[in-house]
UniProtKB/Swiss-Prot annotation:
Present in larval hemolymph and synthesized by the fat body. Glycans are attached at residue 183. Residues 1-18 form the signal peptide. The lineage of its organism: Eukaryota, Metazoa, Ecdysozoa, Arthropoda, Hexapoda. Monomer. Keywords: Glycoprotein, Signal. This is Ommochrome-binding protein. The keyword Glycoprotein applies. The keyword Acetylation does not apply. InterPro entries: WD40/YVTN_repeat-like_dom_sf (IPR015943).
């Protein structure tokens, strides 16, 4: 009888785990595949489809102190490593057209070398980089630790005057070339046709990303959202809380959602049923 009860309890626990590890996105079922565990607070995720490699920053303990490091994860081989050469690395972005991986550190912009698994400061700015977003047309957008917006293009770094009146923690460019930015007050849109800033709502945005078609998304601690630029609405695709709170997100080469939580990097893979 005791064995039967234990068996039933085990089945119940397994069922609960299966439910927890399955999510429904736009009416489709997805399972959670852990790509990397024991990786603390992976942040600022970006993906290089040519090399099937994910880039991010993460927190680590060194001599009882918390430090920021940059890392890479090959999604095919699950090979993980620390990127050397970046001072207090925080931000990542990928130029898929020219095959350049950009990394942001405390003292400027770096590029990644696959051969040496290291990064080199390209010497265009000494600003402390917080976040990056690459746009094929307009260049490398980035924000600084004091929440100011900039763009790097054609060898020049310029402050984005249109968005500089408000603090900018993270930013991105939409399908229609409008600039989206977020701070502690929420998410905003700078419409380049009207030169007006539009309040899109009180969302705690920690990262922007886009899929292979250029559609814009963002993550927050409580979920992952699609940005509907036509009606300026935010469509919540994933809800998470507690230890599963989302730190950042990206898309792989097949447009599967990859995101990080407190201690893992997870990919959503199609599943028949939850």
């Amino acid at each position: 009888m005791k064995l039967l009860i234990l068996t039933i309890c085990a089945l119940h626990v397994n069922q609960m785990m299966a439910l927890k590890d399955c999510v429904v996105v736009n009416g489709k079922n997805y399972g959670k595949e852990v790509l990397k565990d024991n990786i603390h607070q992976a942040y600022q995720l970006s993906f290089d489809p040519q090399q099937n490699t994910l880039f991010f920053s993460y927190s680590d303990e060194v001599d009882s102190k918390t430090v920021l490091k940059m890392g890479y994860l090959n999604l095919a081989t699950k090979s993980f490593g620390e990127i050397s050469g970046v001072k207090d690395g925080m931000a990542t972005a990928v130029d898929t057209t020219n095959h350049i991986v950009y990394l942001g550190g405390k003292d400027g912009i770096y590029t990644y070398d696959y051969a040496t698994k290291s990064a080199k400061n390209i010497g265009v700015t000494s600003l402390s980089i917080w976040q990056m977003f690459y746009c094929p047309i307009h260049g490398l957008f980035f924000t600084t630790s004091d929440e100011k917006p900039y763009v790097f293009k054609d060898g020049q770094v310029n402050q984005i005057v249109e968005a500089s009146s408000s603090k900018t923690r993270v930013m991105a460019v939409g399908e229609h070339h409008d600039v989206f930015f977020a701070n502690s007050s929420g998410i905003f849109l700078f419409n380049h046709h009207t030169n007006k800033v539009i309040d899109l709502g009180d969302y705690n945005v920690n990262a922007f990303t886009k899929d292979s078609k250029g559609k814009l998304y963002f993550s927050s601690p409580v979920g992952f959202y699609a940005v509907n630029e036509a009606d300026r609405k935010m469509n919540k695709l994933i809800s998470e809380t507690g230890e599963d709170s989302i730190w950042g997100a990206a898309f792989d080469k097949d447009d599967n959602i990859v995101y990080s939580n407190e201690d893992n990097i997870v990919k959503l893979v199609p599943k028949d049923k939850c």
